[in-house]
Regions:
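Intrinsically disordered, low-complexity regulatory segments enriched in Ser/Thr/Pro
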Residues: 37-61
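Amphipathic, interaction-prone secondary-structure segments
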Residues: 15-44
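Negatively charged, low-complexity tracts enriched in Asp/Glu with abundant Ser/Thr
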Residues: 1-22, 54-65
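Short, charged, intrinsically disordered terminal tails
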Residues: 67-72
Length: 72
């Protein structure tokens, strides 16, 4: 299983709603939090941004950080 699919599966189990915008962009949302991920293929993250109450909060290129965000 590739990183993108694995992240989609684990986030769904934690109550996140995933929307695939296109072949490179996924948006996860739950409550007031929205996380936007941009991928290079299905295994390499280009970057991700987290928004809380529609305000930009942080940016990362680290998949481990994204996993931590999704554990909120």
């Amino acid at each position: 299983m590739d990183e993108r699919a694995a992240l989609a599966q684990s986030s769904e189990e934690q109550g996140w709603r995933r929307r695939a915008i296109d072949e490179r962009v996924d948006v996860y949302s739950r409550g007031a939090i929205r996380i936007r991920l941009i991928w290079q293929g299905n295994s390499k993250l280009s970057g991700a941004s987290i928004f809380v109450d529609e305000w930009y909060d942080n940016y990362t290129r680290d998949l481990g950080t994204v996993r931590a965000w999704l554990k909120r």
